């Protein structure tokens, strides 16, 4: 079993930052590192499709190619912004497939993440079918999780904590382990 973790964006990606200037990739990568550690402890091989240093924003086509070469699962980790003029909030999970099980997987990941972190989304449907490139083009099961809103005064102090990052990582790990049974 190989899981590809995709920590979205890179340090130089313009506009991808928190209200306090913290770059999105920093938050994404911290969660990705926790996921890698937790899955590795369970004997699952983890590869990353992003640049571990964050110095470059790896093109989406390269991320997908890396996943398609080896992965049995693809999880893209992001943090959200810009919804409702800073009034968006909570976790959102995106999926894209003609297979009905993909929506069930997305809902399972969302429920696990909210169950562990308590950061419930304020959207009417926080599990969304969306044709993002990394979801459309990967051959294995693929989900994209937005781990709270960087421009939300409610979410920001929560998403910057190690406790939250570890909680999201635990949710991803538990989801993968449960789904492969």
Put a short name on every predicted segment:
Residues 3-6, 15, 69-70, 74-76, ...:
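Active-site-adjacent mobile loop/cap segments within catalytic or ligand-binding domains
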Residues 20, 86, 106, 160-162:
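Hydrophobic alpha-helical segments
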Residues 2-101:
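Catalytic-core regions of hydrolytic enzymes
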Residues 36-44, 68-72, 110-118, 173, ...:
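Sec-exported extracytoplasmic/periplasmic mature domains
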Residues 11, 19, 27, 38-39, ...:
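Generic detector of leucine side chains in alpha-helical contexts
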Residues 100-128:
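Active-site-adjacent substrate-binding region
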Residues 32, 36, 64, 103-110, ...:
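Extracytoplasmic/secreted envelope proteins and their assembly/folding machinery
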Residues 19-20, 46-48, 52-57, 123-141:
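A broadly tuned preference for mixed-charge, low-complexity surface segments
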